[in-house]
Amino acid sequence: VSAIFGLVASILIIWTGDGSAYQVAQKQPMKLAAMEGLYEGGNGVGLVGIGILNPAKTSYLDNQNAFIFDIKFPKLLSFLAERDMNAYVPGIVNLIEGGYTTNKGTVALSAKEKIEKGKTAIKALADYRKAVKDKDTAAAAQYRVTLEENFPYFGYGYIKDPAELIPHVGLTFYSFRVMVILGCFFILLFIITLIWDKKGKIANTRWLQYVGLWSIPLGYIAGQAGWIVAEVGRQ
């Protein structure tokens, strides 16, 4: 019963995880780029299955390769992000510099432009509050329009350096892979357990019992890795 429950739960988690990854791509593209160690985006981008980040790469501005070694599933990241194998997925550099055409047909703003709009929104809010306090309705209406136009970038107004917008790539990248690899491991473990149980061998298979026992902490590790990805990469 526990193996059946574990298998169903693991499959559901992967299914909901796919939906979460899609939402990340839509709402927090910088997190997705950090999860994949993706500095330069493009069309038909592959998903890194296994990879070792290059420790010599310390800035998005340097010319170092992002990886020492990596194996990718062709075009899978584009499908994960946009449900289109050939869709464009921006990388860290693209998100900072802007200027690319999004899949919605709009031109992406640069980080500096977003920061300026954020500062404009912050100032407009202060001016609006002052105008309301002074009962200057005309000025208040004007400042409110400015605030509403720039409000989507309000938080950017507190950013001093565009590099602050980049999550810790190494921590996010490896945590994501720990979570995914353990999730796949659990599915395999539960399938093997069910097969052995159906054959009536599980009671006498000590190694499988030990693997099941030793796997208990891995569930907590997978959960914590997921939280690291969620919080460290938050935008």
Language-model-derived ranges and their functions:
Residues 11-21, 191-201, 224-230:
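Transmembrane helix-loop junctions and nearby membrane-interface residues
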Residues 5-13, 132, 213-233:
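Hydrophobic alpha-helical membrane-insertion segments
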Residues 140-171, 175, 182, 217-235:
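Membrane-proximal extracellular juxtamembrane segment immediately upstream
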Residues 1, 181-222:
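Juxtamembrane interface at the cytosolic side of transmembrane helices
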